């Protein structure tokens, strides 16, 4: 009989079962092998009522609970013998689960599911393996929430517990089409959250081993409704990032569907799987709704009094109020746009970081305006200072007191161009189109970039698009007995005469230096440099109070004393490398600085001329580092002039190539909008080409270099022979800029 049974039921032999009397087995079914058969008893969508945590109104009241139970069996036993004794009686399971659920209170879905699994695996139900899916369709106002767990009688945990959020229906700005950048559209989000189902020896295992779904949902809803992503991939990834980083989710599946994406499809969407390790500290990017991480752009304007002083004072006050300025644009002068009968404006934009929320930021900016004396008499009329929030990250706000993005930004060149100075690839949060595209659509750009001189309350402007500015002449006044060009023929007695000649000949700036910079020259003591230049600057300031004086020095202490004596500009041939205090000093003094490219020092610069395969690319890299360092030190971008360093750390061929390709260097994105100074005057390479050994005789080589500089887009020329070079620049401006 037993032999017959074994023959009829070879399944027993396969699984190593031994049949005894009745329904008793000496050897139990191996659970892992049982699961491979996928034989299951189901109870689908059993709706009961119970208190499971809080309902959608945050109350501990009865709410519907939908249960689906799957219990592992060996269907071959009960099927072949047609005997329920070999299976699980789902009626018994139903009764026991019903009794448990409707007569108990549960902390959360995990507590409920865990206790149901213990009932199914208990002596009455005789289960060995169970999958419990528990849902609370009324658990949240916007979505259905639920949980799936798998438990075994032997206590082994096979897979992670899975919390799920289904059919979270929200409205947000999403897409790349123009209409999608204006109108919010419906999206459906499904989430599956994985949690390691560790069998903790603790009564409150269900409390320790769960997620705060309510808190997670609240943040996701806020995040999605405030977001303005162009792709659902970006939105899905941001949801995964927030979940894993902010809520400690171990692993997540995010599904995002756009219900209106395709005319003849129910939806189009994306599904991603991410774990917490995907967002490690090395590649973690904060959520876009993290206030401290959002890029905030503030526009600044003034058209009364000392305009640049008001703008600089506003920036200083912002830093005091916790509004950290990260980057500034160039400064532009613009004609009044709305109320025409008023003075021209200075305009700029700064990128800031702040923990203030938009409404708080607006309050602080308005307070700064009040502190600086702004009184509004006429709408869009004259004002000493005007501060506006242009963008606040991706936020879109439309309240009675604040509209973000600024409603008139797209019609204002004096805001669009400064934005591009800071970030060339910036896009409008609502339309998704680039700021550059809007700027190009404006036909009449009635703005011009300016270099302001705070203590003179004046500025010089530069060419921009259709507006053409003349090339400015910086006259060299070296008060050095070891000067490489003239042996130091200038004395204090002749300073006034020489400066008067320079001014009459067309010079705009007088560059005074007390330290020779020729290769091989020695560095004089600090006291000696101060003795040479400070009295001369004071004398010139007294005699010619309106002349712009530049101090040619690489020492911060000399620069500070020179500015206090009357200098308006610092010209540092080392680009801030020789004195680590230089950039901070210039930032504090609030004056422009000319940053020159060079390598090494006066003794070894001629040996440091290896620029690899492309001198322009290498100079760009090295000069950009100096530029970034200056800006990080607090020097506004509008107070920076660049100099490629002709004759410094460059061979004859490299100097010629630099002149020939100067426009290529100037056009680099990292130097966008910055003015350039070139100093080819009487340099050794000009004399080598023309055969003039004596510096005084190198005028013809200098002439050609000046013409080349202007043709390449140079803004300021630093020269010795002012009269001749001014004439040359006038003719060059007529040819290259059509100024005549």
UniProtKB/Swiss-Prot annotation:
Where Mg(2+) binds, per the record, is at 478
The cross-references to InterPro entries, in alphabetical order and at most eight, read: DHP_synth-like, DHP_synth_dom, Dihydropteroate_synth-like_sf, FolB_dom, Folic_acid_synth, GTP-CH-I_C/QueF, Hppk, Hppk_sf
Pinpoint the Pterin-binding domain residues: 471-730
Which sites bind (7,8-dihydropterin-6-yl)methyl diphosphate? Answer: 517, 552, 571, 643, 683, 718-720
- The ranges of region (HPPK) come to 291-449
Q: Which GO terms describe its molecular function?
A: 2-amino-4-hydroxy-6-hydroxymethyldihydropteridine diphosphokinase activity; ATP binding; dihydroneopterin aldolase activity; dihydropteroate synthase activity; kinase activity; metal ion binding
The lineage is: Eukaryota, Fungi, Dikarya, Ascomycota, Taphrinomycotina
| Reactions catalysed, as given in the entry | 7,8-dihydroneopterin = 6-hydroxymethyl-7,8-dihydropterin + glycolaldehyde; 6-hydroxymethyl-7,8-dihydropterin + ATP = (7,8-dihydropterin-6-yl)methyl diphosphate + AMP + H(+); (7,8-dihydropterin-6-yl)methyl diphosphate + 4-aminobenzoate = 7,8-dihydropteroate + diphosphate
Region DHNA 2, annotated ranges: 161-280
From the UniProt entry, list the residue stretches annotated as the region DHNA 1.
Answer: 39-160
Chain's role: Catalyzes three sequential steps of tetrahydrofolate biosynthesis.
Q: Which UniProt keywords apply?
A: ATP-binding, Folate biosynthesis, Kinase, Lyase, Magnesium, Metal-binding, Multifunctional enzyme, Nucleotide-binding, Transferase
Instruction: Return any one Pfam family short name.
Output: Pterin_bind
Q: Name one GO cellular component term.
A: mitochondrial envelope
UniProt-listed PROSITE patterns: DHPS_1, DHPS_2, HPPK, PTERIN_BINDING
A Gene Ontology biological process term: tetrahydrofolate biosynthetic process
Extract the coiled-coil ranges from the record.
Answer: none
Under which EC number(s) is this enzyme classified? 4.1.2.25, 2.7.6.3, 2.5.1.15
Which PANTHER family does the record associate with it?
A: FOLATE SYNTHESIS PROTEINS, FOLIC ACID SYNTHESIS PROTEIN FOL1
Activity-pH dependence: Optimum pH is 8.
Q: Which SMART domains match?
A: FolB (SM00905)
> Keyword Transferase, does the record have it?
yes
Protein name, as recorded: Folic acid synthesis protein fol1
Q: Which cofactor does it need?
A: Mg(2+)
What residue intervals traverse the membrane?
none
Q: Which gene specifies this protein's sequence?
A: fol1
Q: Which family does it belong to?
A: In the N-terminal section; belongs to the DHNA family. In the central section; belongs to the HPPK family.
- Part of which pathway? Cofactor biosynthesis; tetrahydrofolate biosynthesis; 2-amino-4-hydroxy-6-hydroxymethyl-7,8-dihydropteridine diphosphate from 7,8-dihydroneopterin triphosphate: step 3/4; Cofactor biosynthesis; tetrahydrofolate biosynthesis; 2-amino-4-hydroxy-6-hydroxymethyl-7,8-dihydropteridine diphosphate from 7,8-dihydroneopterin triphosphate: step 4/4; Cofactor biosynthesis; tetrahydrofolate biosynthesis; 7,8-dihydrofolate from 2-amino-4-hydroxy-6-hydroxymethyl-7,8-dihydropteridine diphosphate and 4-aminobenzoate: step 1/2
